[in-house]
C-alpha cells in the first residue's frame, strides 16, 4: 500500500479510520486523522496485531485518552511555587510527589512527570526508560512535554504495553490484568 501523505510503501493498516470512529464515537475527525498513522505504526511495531490484542489496546487507549481528547493528565492546573513544584496539598503533589515507585525522587517530579501520551506514561522512571529506548532525553527542560505530541503519545503507549507484556494478557482476553497494569 502506498501512503499518500508520504508516498512511501507501508504495510496494510491494522485498523481503519472507520473502525476507529466506531470505537472512539465521540472523537473529533481531526483527532482520528492525527492519530491514525502513528497508531497503525505502533500496532505493527509492538506486535499488537491480532484482533484480541488490537481490541484490548484500543479499549485502553480509548479509556485513558477520553476517546483521543486527552494526551496529558487532566487534573486541574496546580498552583506551582517559584521552582515549578506543585504546592503542598494539591492533587498533583499528593498523588505523585515523592512516589518512589514511579521514580519520583526529586522535588517537582510529581507534576513534571505527570501522565502524558495515550495511556498516560507517568513518573520519572518511566520517562527515563522510554527515553533510553528512544535514545532521546525526555527528562530535561521541557522535554517531558514531547510525550504529549501525537507520534510519541502513541508510541509511548505501545512501548509501555510491550514492556509490561500486555499482549500475553490480551491473548487470554484478560481485561482485568491489563487494566491493573495500566
How would you describe each model-predicted region?
Residues 1-10:
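Short, Lys/Arg-enriched N-terminal segments with co-localized hydrophobic residues
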Residues 10-31, 38, 62-160:
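Peptidoglycan-targeting cell-wall enzymes and recognition modules
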Residues 22-55, 182:
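N-terminal carbohydrate-binding/catalytic regions of secreted carbohydrate-active enzymes
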Residues 40, 58, 157-158, 179:
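Non-transmembrane alpha-helical segments in soluble domains
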Residues 44-49, 139-148, 170-173:
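Short, mixed-charge amphipathic alpha-helical segments
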Residues 51-65:
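Active-site-adjacent structural elements in enzyme catalytic domains
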Residues 61-64, 170-182:
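Acidic helix/loop microenvironments that form the catalytic cleft of cell-wall polysaccharide enzymes
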Residues 152-154, 163-170:
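Proteins synthesized as precursors that undergo proteolytic processing into mature forms
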Amino acid at each position: 500500500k502506498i501512503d499518500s501523505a508520504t508516498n512511501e510503501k507501508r504495510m496494510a493498516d491494522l485498523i481503519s479510520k472507520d473502525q476507529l470512529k466506531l470505537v472512539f464515537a465521540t472523537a473529533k475527525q481531526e483527532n482520528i486523522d492525527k492519530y491514525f498513522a502513528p497508531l497503525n505504526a505502533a500496532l505493527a511495531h509492538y506486535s499488537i496485531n491480532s484482533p484480541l490484542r488490537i481490541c484490548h489496546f484500543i479499549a485502553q487507549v480509548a479509556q485513558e485518552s477520553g476517546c483521543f481528547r486527552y494526551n496529558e493528565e487532566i487534573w486541574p492546573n496546580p498552583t506551582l511555587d517559584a521552582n515549578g513544584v506543585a504546592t503542598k496539598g494539591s492533587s498533583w503533589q499528593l498523588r505523585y510527589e515523592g512516589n518512589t515507585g514511579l521514580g519520583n525522587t526529586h522535588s517537582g517530579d510529581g507534576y513534571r512527570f505527570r501522565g502524558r501520551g495515550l495511556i498516560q506514561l507517568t513518573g520519572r522512571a518511566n520517562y527515563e526508560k522510554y527515553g533510553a529506548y528512544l535514545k532521546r532525553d525526555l527528562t530535561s527542560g521541557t522535554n517531558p512535554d514531547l510525550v504529549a505530541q501525537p507520534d510519541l503519545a502513541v508510541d509511548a503507549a505501545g512501548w509501555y504495553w510491550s514492556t509490561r507484556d500486555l499482549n500475553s494478557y490480551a491473548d487470554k482476553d484478560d481485561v482485568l490484568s491489563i487494566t491493573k497494569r495500566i
